[in-house]
Design a protein with these regions (language model features):
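Active-site-adjacent betaalpha module
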Residues: 1-50, 54-90, 98-313
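Glycine-rich, histidine-containing beta strand-loop boundary motifs that form or position
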Residues: 95
């Protein structure tokens, strides 16, 4: 593991396994103010860190969509982070944010014969909506069209997820040691973090931090956020970590590669922290294998696959 000599005295990597607690923002801010680091605005080489959805529902074992291995991911990420914080100029931290009625929740669909709603991890396919195995409770025309568009444009079926990262609930919070690290870095480097709230568009899925799977024409902000994409890629290096590798992290990477795939000199700026992210476990779908196959293709295109044990050059 990387050296963590910059970590404040109150940091303990075991906090990644501690479970929910109130983040010590004041204490970590004061520690950052005493760290004697230069302001990020003076960095000659600009480095961005994208933290995707390190939230309780994904990271804590009691979370409703717990990703196995995610606590270890956080521990490795934080160790790497405190070893390299003097080089990190910008932090982008996303928060998956949901409401009770959304197209990927069971409340949106039902079986017209039994009245039952689909269970979590059910896939809703084009055949399902054509044969009326599942019918939408809300927005019927859009919902059926969405399932078709998702298959045609994204080559995916609609997945029904457990209720997770509900706005205002504990599961929505970033895990405390991540919040503490961001507060420390903000004070130590005089750098305002960027929080990206995603997922409140009820008629579409929103995995990647830069835009929805299928943009909703009634919600302009669901379209690909090219302004943020371009801002991120103005950095000389971009490091990416978070949960889950198979979904929100992979889609974030996919959006970056999609935007800059014709510029290999920019793709080389992307660094995927592959031991700081894990995949959703599904009863029948090997999401990790699917993610690894696509990441291997991205690596061939120029994306750097790195480990947290490797310091920033």
């Amino acid at each position: 593991m990387a050296n963590r000599s910059l970590a404040p005295a109150l940091f303990d990597v075991q906090d990644a396994f501690k479970g929910p607690y109130a983040p010590r923002i004041q204490a970590f801010t004061e520690a950052g103010q005493q760290a004697d680091l230069t302001a990020a605005q003076n960095d000659v080489e600009k480095i961005a860190l994208i933290l995707v959805d390190y939230q309780h529902d994904f990271v804590d074992p009691t979370g409703t969509l717990y990703v196995p291995g995610s606590q270890q991911d956080v521990a490795r990420l934080l160790t790497w982070f405190y070893a390299n914080a003097h080089r990190i100029s910008s932090i982008y931290a996303s928060l998956d944010t949901h409401l009770p009625f959304q197209i990927f929740y069971s409340s949106w669909w039902k079986n017209p014969q039994t009245g039952e709603h689909p269970q979590p991890y059910t896939t809703v396919t084009v055949d399902d909506v054509t044969n009326m195995k599942w019918v939408p409770v809300f927005q019927p025309n859009w919902s059926v069209s969405y399932v078709h568009q998702l298959q045609e444009k994204a080559k995916k079926d609609l997945m029904i997820w457990p209720y997770h990262t509900m706005e205002g609930a504990l599961g929505h919070m970033l895990v405390a040691p991540i919040s503490e690290a961001i507060a420390w870095h903000s004070a130590a480097r005089n750098a305002q973090p960027t929080y990206v709230v995603k997922g409140r568009t009820i008629r579409t899925e929103y995995y990647g931090i830069f835009g929805a799977e299928i943009p909703d024409p009634e919600v302009p902000e669901s379209s690909l956020n090219v302004t943020m994409l371009d801002a991120v890629m103005k950095h000389d290096r971009v490091y990416i970590a978070g949960e889950a590798k198979s979904h929100c992290v992979l889609e974030t990477e996919r959006q970056l590669v999609g935007r800059f795939g014709n510029r290999p000199e920019l793709l080389k700026r992307l660094h995927f922290l592959r031991d700081c992210t894990s995949s959703v476990q599904h009863p029948t779908i090997d999401f990790d294998a699917l993610a690894n196959a696509e990441l291997a293709t991205m690596e061939q295109q120029g994306v750097q696959m790195v480990l947290s044990s490797e310091p920033i050059p």
